[in-house]
Amino acid sequence: MAEGEEKNGIIDSIPLFAKELIAGGVTGGIAKTAVAPLERIKILFQTRRDEFKRIGLVGSINKIGKTEGLMGFYRGNGASVARIVPYAALHYMAYEEYRRWIIFGFPDTTRGPLLDLVAGSFAGGTAVLFTYPLDLVRTKLAYQVVGSAKTQVKAIPVEQIIYRGIVDCFSRTYRESGARGLYRGVAPSLYGIFPYAGLKFYFYEEMKRHVPPEHKQDISLKLVCGSVAGLLGQTLTYPLDVVRRQMQVERLYSAVKEETRRGTMQTLFKIAREEGWKQLFSGLSINYLKVVPSVAIGFTVYDIMKLHLRVPPREEPEAEAVTTRKRKVFT
């Protein structure tokens, strides 16, 4: 009993923002790892690994399993988790901070989906800027394929491109292209994350408004709202994600086939012209399969973490009272 009270005392001494940071980070890491195999295949589809696109999802799973083993499904996941933990924590914190800043800075602002659209968009952009180099490294590592004579998998020449891990990829990219190289493809990322993050929050809040009051706290309904919001946001912004991936692996691809793509719009139109508009949605079906379990796992883990960390629920009446007090200060 005393031990339990002491444990609760330690947990209660942790600042609320730190609890939210921990909960968000753990949630991001677990959810991302759970869907890592689908993420790997999606990246291979997006970056024109034709030998995988031809055989589809099931064939790609079999091929990776035979040529690279179980760990092949998690190639690049270390960098992905290293990115998603701070990204998820920062994204959540930034969203709350931007939301409060808008409410307190502009007291007459009406609460609703539009507020979440703006706060979510800026939070997404902030998180991307701080964690983008890790996303770049994750993509480069996931793009690499170990060759096999038996299965005729086209591999990148080992002596030219293969990175030995996260640190090696970071250092080589920096030596070859400087800090600018670590942000190759960040423009389409920002173009995509601003509407995606904003639309995700917008759709989620808009759908929640139509949920009957007695079901507001129903986890299954929150899960459905979050999944649909994620799917809608992904569909509308997916072409920019494809452009980002191809820009990220541009140098690796050109080592096998001479090709240079420069700006975001140049890349987008060149993909459409040479490979067809269909390529801009390559891997989208896999992304649909990835988003739903990712959101489901995210909701579950986040709720469990908040429960263990004794994070109090965010009560709108209390928030409204704080806003009212702030408005009086401004006036």
From Swiss-Prot:
Solcar repeats lie at residues 15-101, 111-210, 217-308. It is found in: Mitochondrion inner membrane. It comes from the Eukaryota. The keyword Transmembrane helix applies. Gene3D superfamilies: Mitochondrial carrier domain. It comes from Arabidopsis thaliana. One of its GO terms (cellular component) is mitochondrial inner membrane. Required for the accumulation of coenzyme A in the mitochondrial matrix. This is Mitochondrial carrier protein CoAc2. Keywords: Membrane, Mitochondrion, Mitochondrion inner membrane, Repeat, Transmembrane, Transmembrane helix, Transport. GO terms for biological process: mitochondrial coenzyme A transmembrane transport. Expressed throughout the plant. The gene is COAC2. GO terms for molecular function: coenzyme A transmembrane transporter activity.
